Amino acid sequence: MLRHLQVARVSGLCFWSGTMLAAPFEQRLEAAVAGGFTSISVFPMDCPDTRRAHALRSMSEARGVRIGALDPFTRWLPGWQAPKGIAPEFLALVGCEADAFFETAEALGATSMTVLEPFGRRHGMGELVEGFAAVCDRAARSGIRVHLEFTPFSGIPDLETAFEIVCGADRANGGLVFDTWHYLRGRPDASLLETIPGPRIFVVQVSDAAREPVGSLVEDTMFNRRLPGEGDWDLEGLLAALLSKPGLGEVGIEVLSRSLMRLGPREIGSRCGEALRRLLDEAGARLPV
């Protein structure tokens, strides 16, 4: 155990909807309630209009779950265009137009939003910084925080690149998503992680995995993640290092798994909540009451 480290109180526990990517929002909310999560993320495709967004907000509040992030926003860089042959269901997930995205975020009462680059296109650092800063400025008018997510198969492939963008933009409402899968399957850099201030890591997304990828990286991240404690990674050590940072944000779970999706919503939520709390307890975290 690593309880000798001074760790921060976890501000909340988020059920990231990617865990039940193919399920309707109502089932994801049922899972979040069953797992004792304090917040839930929403996809833009969940809300074809603001009326639906208001309905999801009311539904969540009635169950005692706050809507946290609207995830993801991808139309923030020059030349956004979906590649030929992209699956329609993936385009529905990532293709939301900017005005519609921000209208939805406001209607939901979302407190944050995720920004990522979905197609693996490379951009100069100047374009990345300028684009991220512009998103932060627009979001700030609605009191929304913006967290940038890196993925090893995207145009923002690692923590180093993402942190450089966040630092270059230098916006108070701009920070990072730290997804354990993306970090450990990419270029993990403990020395760099140690230098990043806790307040710049807005959210932590937790999942475990096999030591080596099962299939391609995309297949591994979309279908073969595991619950914390069911894989081969030292998540306890990683979480303890993260939680030792003063001002670290919310911690949540995002486990995209074929085997998990065979279960019902309540069992998925319960297993996710139990696994995440067990890991946080082992890492020495003080959980929200």
Identify the function of each model-found stretch.
Residues W76-K84, F119-R122, G186, S259-L263:
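A short acidic, helix-capping loop that chelates divalent metal ions and anchors anionic groups
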Residues S41-E61, F119-G120:
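Glycine-rich, proline-tolerant flexible connector loops at the mouths of alpha/beta enzymes
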Residues S41, A69-D71, T114, H147, ...:
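Conserved beta-strand positions in the central sheet of alpha/beta enzyme cores
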Residues L5, P24-E26, Q81-G175, R286:
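Active-site acidic/histidine proton-transfer and metal-coordination neighborhood
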Residues M1-V33, E61, G109, L159-G174, ...:
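Histidine-acidic metal/acid-base catalytic patches
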Residues R57-T74, V129-A140, A169, W233-L238:
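Alpha-helix-loop-beta-strand connector modules within alpha/beta enzyme cores
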Residues W16-M20, F43-C47, P72-R75, P118-G120, ...:
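Active-site beta-loop-alpha junctions enriched in small/polar residues
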Residues A31-T50, D71:
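N-terminal substrate-binding region of glycoside hydrolase catalytic domains
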